[in-house]
Amino acid sequence: MKNFFLSLKTTVWTLFTLVCLFFVGSYMMPAHKEVFSAMNDQILFHWVDNTASGNLGQTWWFFAALAALVLLTINTLVCSLQAIKGRWSREDFLLRISPQVIHAGFLFILLGHLLGAGWGFKLSGMMPEGAFAPLPESMALRLQEIRVKTDERGYTLDWAAEASIYEDNALVKTGILGPNKPLFYKGVGIYLKSLDFERGPAALLVIAKDPGAVWAFVGGVLFILGSMTLLALKWNVRV
């Protein structure tokens, strides 16, 4: 069993299986929007519990991909532990540590997505100007004002919204939301997506908390650093 997880063939075939499953998913997701569209409106584990588990005919590839990722994670851990146990020398330290940094980055990225999938939250909806809405973790949001800047012909030049965050009924932060300009507080991000004036000024907001974002960022940095270092060392050896 240990040799199975140490084998490079296990890695290659697992990656090949993942590519095939993702190819199937690229067809299934647009073909069954009624099942997969909810993935954008809630965290992953909630979607799995509420939707995916009851539609296995359309989501089987997703669960198979999760199983393949678990196998790849175990394969990565076993290979890294085996490599660390070997003898180390100053001459080949960087050459041997670089792949382990890449592995660590990959595992941190997976950890980040796992945390975000299970312990975050994602809410979305239209919020009228002046409205007050409760949020998880004893927080609340108030949309104070919607601002639209137009030219002399009435065309929109810019738009924004002022929002306030409350915690335990106390005002803790106020900021301006705009396109690509979210408001953050304690890991909670508030995003302004669009405005609606048909039924009075209202804003389409997305409120999300991803506790794994930092871990995924660290993993991405480690993965890039390890890859660049390994590539540079291999290049020097060839030259």
Describe the function of each predicted region.
Residues 1-239:
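Solvent-exposed, non-transmembrane regions of integral membrane proteins
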